[in-house]
Design a protein with these regions (language model features):
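Specific transmembrane alpha-helical segments of multi-pass solute transporters/efflux pumps
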Residues: 1-4, 34-80, 116
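Juxtamembrane helix-loop-helix junctions in multi-pass membrane proteins
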Residues: 1-25, 69-75, 152-160
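Transmembrane alpha-helical segments that form core, pore/gating elements
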Residues: 3, 25-30, 87-93, 125-160
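Juxtamembrane helix-entry segments on the extracytoplasmic side of multipass membrane proteins
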Residues: 10-19, 38-44, 119-149
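Hydrophobic residues within alpha-helical transmembrane segments
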Residues: 20-24, 47, 51, 82, ...
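Transmembrane-helix signature of multi-pass solute transporters
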Residues: 24-32, 59, 86-90, 109-116
Length: 160
């Protein structure tokens, strides 16, 4: 998905690329699945789920589209992948998910994994990361916020 969004954004721009991808996706859904029965969906789920989902997709698409280079797009995609760890944390904090002490090393290991991937073959160089963030701050900010939004989406929609 990261590659698709980045490739289309390079041709159509960040906003145009996102609009094209999601417009085409919507049309494909209508033709393959049909129109949803909106009245059968709980209003709270529809409102919260729609708001969070659309916000996340906007953050993801624009964060990839605004990345200055393809390498930054990969980094931004990895920043976005903080959402699984955040989802677990949110489920514990907000949904009362039962856990034990092993969750702490597990979450730390997940964070180290994201950092490891961000570092690539050369290792993690904080000066390069800071340089990339200062080059495209909006891109990294949107990816980071998107991770929190998607974790919130997973946590909130799980209640319905």
């Amino acid at each position: 998905m990261v590659g698709l969004i980045r490739g289309v954004s390079e041709g159509l721009g960040p906003v145009g690329g996102a609009a094209a991808i999601y417009s085409l996706s919507g049309l494909l859904l209508i033709f393959t699945v049909g129109f949803p029965r909106i009245r059968q969906i709980p209003k709270g789920y529809l409102l919260a789920g729609s708001l969070l989902f659309v916000s996340y997709e906007i953050c993801l698409a624009l964060s990839l589209g605004y990345a200055a280079t393809r390498h930054q797009a990969i980094e931004v995609g990895m920043v976005n992948y903080l959402w699984p760890s955040l989802t677990i944390l949110f489920a514990i904090l907000f949904n009362g998910q039962k856990t034990n002490w092993l969750i702490v090393p597990g979450l730390l290991l997940a964070l180290v994994g994201v950092c490891w991937v961000l570092g690539g073959d050369n290792g993690l160089h904080y000066d390069e990361i800071i340089n990339n963030i200062t080059t495209s701050p909006l891109s990294y900010f949107l990816a980071f916020i998107g991770a929190f939004i998607w974790a919130a989406y997973c946590t909130v929609t799980n209640k319905y």
